[in-house]
């Protein structure tokens, strides 16, 4: 076609009631002395034209003119591709008036030419030939032009008849693959090619065509980094300003994004090129708009396979179901399960002789994250005990070096749920390994009234054993453990003696604390006994007798320990005197 700009021509008024959008040049440029002899109506808009230019290039117009009755000079074209504006361009072509074929009108022109049967059978280099030539020579050789044409196909369903969308999709994928090969030779171009061109260009497509394009790219082995960058940008653009729970289009977009996520060569989900924040964002949006269960599980599985890189904010997924709890604990529990499955699979693949340092490091990181998560959700008064303990039970014991975090979470849960039974409190406290508590946490336990008495006694007993072990020097590999949990080694007899003196003082201080605690328990016991006697008379005698024996054992335990410590202190003093005598 010519290179002139598209003409904007005034309309004329033919001698009929219908308005004509065809300018006088249509009737005077070629046939200056012949008036228009046919009226074509397109979507209610009339065009006064000449039969000869139309029938010379259009098979459909030739048939319709031939079928006209002698008294009629009007033809009506229904559902014309592109409407009156596109019909005007086709008439300009028939009259030999130059205009530009562009990426914005080529689809309409190609569909209109097919509708009017403007083939080579009627005229050489007819409109179908010109439109197809533009597609082949200009559009399909350019990534940008192909995207523009594919966008215009969304409003032209008839374009599917001529396979324009399919050809655009293949052209986009081929151009992307070609540019990848070029950019692969230059590290400078590689990042810009992946993160700028595709992310910006493809975000203009509707979700149906976008899915086809990305699928074609994956089939042609376009870099996964480029595909992921495009997915992230497309999701941010198309899901902006959400969220409507009943929006089918948004649900369709999220589900399509999930299905397009790439896997590595082994089909694994642990591709680090997929940002974890993007996966969590899709999961949170998907939870709100209620995407399919299979898509939710896919997102949870992918998140679980790189859970060690997550943050606390990522895990705080609001609950949108008909529940009273603030957070979606069930989803986090499933994510944690997927993470542990990954660790187990890696252990099975590596075997017993392999170095499992990486897996253990990941497990420790997740342990810290989950402890922080438990602390965050524990104050929720509507959080059920079952869901709270499910998170704790799922993590193995070796996922924590210290249990201070889990103790803090349990303590906060007890504070927010004062109506728990004694058995439920005991069940919670059984998750705490007293040997893994720091000195600070152990001191807090000793003064914590929310904990069962058995828990307090267990912690105090563990602390005593730890101190006794430190004083006796009986520890593995010649080392001993301080109450703070820090391991040390004896450097010289003087250092050992000084350390023993410090430990002796700490032991005496701990015993003093124990006495205070036992005294408080005895006061509580007397108060309970008094109240029970008033309410139940002699019926509560058996229970009180049992409780008295229990507290008596606590006092006895403290007394025996005190005697042993005094004997140990005297032993230390004797060794000191012996050294001085030497």
From Swiss-Prot:
InterPro entries found in the cross-reference section: BTB/POZ_dom (IPR000210), NPH3/RPT2-like (IPR043454), NPH3_dom (IPR027356), SKP1/BTB/POZ_sf (IPR011333)
Coiled coil: none
Residue ranges, compositional bias (Basic and acidic residues): 571-582
Recorded superkingdom: Eukaryota
Segments for region (Disordered): 1-21, 558-582
Keyword terms: Phosphoprotein, Ubl conjugation pathway
Domain NPH3: 196-466
Modification Phosphotyrosine occurs at: 407
BTB domain ranges (all copies): 36-103
Pathway per the UniProt entry: Protein modification; protein ubiquitination
GO biological process: protein ubiquitination
Family to which this protein belongs: Belongs to the NPH3 family.
Domain notes: The BTB/POZ domain mediates the interaction with some component of ubiquitin ligase complexes.
Role: May act as a substrate-specific adapter of an E3 ubiquitin-protein ligase complex (CUL3-RBX1-BTB) which mediates the ubiquitination and subsequent proteasomal degradation of target proteins.
Name recorded for this polypeptide: Putative BTB/POZ domain-containing protein At3g08660
Source species of the chain: Arabidopsis thaliana
